[in-house]
Amino acid sequence: MPSFDIVSELELFEVNHAVQNTQKEIQTRFDFRGQDVSIELNEKSKEIKISTESDFQCEQVYSMLENHFYKRKIDVQALDPQKATASGKNVVQVIKLKDGLDSDTAKKINKAIKESGIKVQSSIQGDKIRVTDKKRDTLQQVMTFLREQQFGLPLQFNNFKD
């Protein structure tokens, strides 16, 4: 019976490239010359830390980061910016990366599939949702339906089996 999995995964090497490209752009921009501006990725805790001298610069760096995410085809819904905090003369903003389906979001997705009226079977299996049906066309309808919905994080469809 045909099936596929719904997951939300981040490719950390692509995120790393986006952060590195943002760092290079910071070094070449005239308005950041002589300023204490940095951006760094912590892959273990899945956080990006922006440190600048003002709120405005922090917003500028975040905008540059979003731009590089778009260029690398990483969905910006994966970014969860926290409130910027002032510490000493620097403003620090932590951006958490959303990776994996949490149980609440998985339940919302499962409920949306059930309420859509499309006759498929879906079940939550850890950090993914398995969707099965007898016809491939029905599974493709589910994919189209889910692409139109907003769940606050990027969804990928993988492990498609006939």
From Swiss-Prot:
Keyword field contains Nucleotide-binding: yes
InterPro entries reported in the protein's UniProt record: DUF520, UPF0234-like_C, UPF0234_N, YajQ-like_sf
Gene Ontology cellular component list: cytosol
GO-annotated molecular function: nucleotide binding
Disulfide bonds: none
Pfam families per UniProt: DUF520 (PF04461)
Protein keywords: Nucleotide-binding
Family per record: Belongs to the YajQ family.
PANTHER family: UPF0234 PROTEIN YAJQ
Record function comment: Nucleotide-binding protein.
Protein name as it appears in the record: Nucleotide-binding protein ACIAD3137
